A protein has these predicted regions:
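Ser/Thr-rich, low-complexity intrinsically disordered terminal regions
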Residues: 1-93
Length: 93
């Protein structure tokens, strides 16, 4: 699942995105630069590890968010929900 989020102030939005990811339950940042975050998110059920990737793209003024399962074919909507929850927090907090 991948979505792009247009933001007005990319630098501050990416700082906010970093805070959101670091505060998300069962999620740990494993790599971070000024424009990229790779986090591992554990699912509630069975504790599978999923990848959560965020990338700031200055040329487009967007934060690209991708959540994907490492194991299995279906995810019961977990990755979509993770991206939706992130988007809600990014736009409302």
């Amino acid at each position: 699942m991948r979505e792009d989020f247009k933001v007005n102030d990319l630098e501050n939005a990416f700082k906010k995105a970093t805070k959101i990811v670091s505060e998300t339950a069962r999620t740990k940042i494993v790599e971070k630069t000024d424009s990229f975050i790779h986090a591992e998110a554990k699912t509630k059920w069975r504790r599978y590890t999923d990848d959560l990737l965020l990338k700031a793209i200055p040329e487009k003024g967007i934060i690209q968010v991708r959540s994907e399962s490492r194991v299995g074919i279906g995810d019961n909507g977990v990755n979509q929900k993770r991206v939706d929850d992130f988007a809600y927090r990014l736009m409302t907090e």
